[in-house]
Amino acid sequence: MAEQDLLKTLGQLITEQRNPNSMQIDTLSAYEIVQIINNEDKQVPLAIEKVLPQIAQAVEKIVEAFQQGGRLVYIGAGTSGRLGVLDASECPPTFGVSPEMVKGIIAGGERALRHPIEGAEDNKEAGKQDLQAVEFSPKDVLVGIAASGRTPYVLGALAYAKELGAITVSIASNPNSAMSQIADIVIDTVVGAEVLTGSSRMKSGTAQKLVLNMLTTASMILIGKCYQNLMVDVQASNQKLVARAIRIVMQATECSREIAETTLALAENNAKLAIMMILADLDKDGAEQLLSQQQGKISRYTIV
């Protein structure tokens, strides 16, 4: 895009406007500065509340994809890409799923997680190529993330996913963006002008993080990765998580610590399996069979 056209485009974006509440921020005390930032951050959950129906719709499509062997793939550049990678990386330890189930892709690759990669976000073809590199398929769901809603790298990825017939979702902080013209489900978290003009790592990034939390958490809940509000599929891979798994078994079954530890050992540190063993008074094999019959959802057994 020519420089003059880019200047005009940026001038029309809400995220590039000057915030009247922070015009004199460079003359304020530390407390006054953080107070302004905090007050602006309060706008984020209010903006998200307005798009909860679209977020729920995206969750339903993600669940359908998971149930059919598909994946959730995030793609973005800069802060947006980093947040996608972060959310994806938390899913295996939290929900006990394969790292392939939720993937995060950032423009410029692994190095871009820590260092800016010049021109990476401007490469539209690279978005397509990076999806091809992970063998993105029509069974998958693509979530494109960009505060501006116009990042070429993300647009290229969305267009390719759309061409394949996959479900596409856009997350942006500007309404009626180029991304929204492609995506099947449009999530526009319009948080307003940033405290520092154009610094979309702030309110826009916070909104993205909250939405991504919702997408994965709600989807995992719906496919049975929790019981009540307990992370029963947590991977007990360190001392803290082993202790958490013991507490989860105790809380879910109201059993003693001794019973929880013993049953967890028999269940090979699988908290969900240990819970089912205790609730149904079954051995490991019997509990595994029952969980399979209930599609991995403990609540289907306890509610009956």
Curated annotation (Swiss-Prot):
Its EC number is 4.2.1.126. This is N-acetylmuramic acid 6-phosphate etherase. Specifically catalyzes the cleavage of the D-lactyl ether substituent of MurNAc 6-phosphate, producing GlcNAc 6-phosphate and D-lactate. Together with AnmK, is also required for the utilization of anhydro-N-acetylmuramic acid (anhMurNAc) either imported from the medium or derived from its own cell wall murein, and thus plays a role in cell wall recycling. InterPro entries: Etherase_MurQ (IPR005488), Glucokinase_regulatory_CS (IPR005486), MURQ/GCKR (IPR040190), SIS_dom (IPR001347), SIS_dom_sf (IPR046348). Coiled coil: none annotated. CDD domains: SIS_Etherase. It comes from the Bacteria. Homodimer. A lyase-type mechanism (elimination/hydration) is suggested for the cleavage of the lactyl ether bond of MurNAc 6-phosphate, with the formation of an alpha,beta-unsaturated aldehyde intermediate with (E)-stereochemistry, followed by the syn addition of water to give product. Residues 62-225 form the SIS domain. The gene is murQ. The active site is at residues 90, 121. Signal peptide: none annotated. One of its GO terms (biological process) is peptidoglycan turnover. One of its GO terms (molecular function) is ether hydrolase activity. It catalyses: N-acetyl-D-muramate 6-phosphate + H2O = N-acetyl-D-glucosamine 6-phosphate + (R)-lactate. It is an enzyme of class 4 (lyase). Keywords: Carbohydrate metabolism, Lyase.
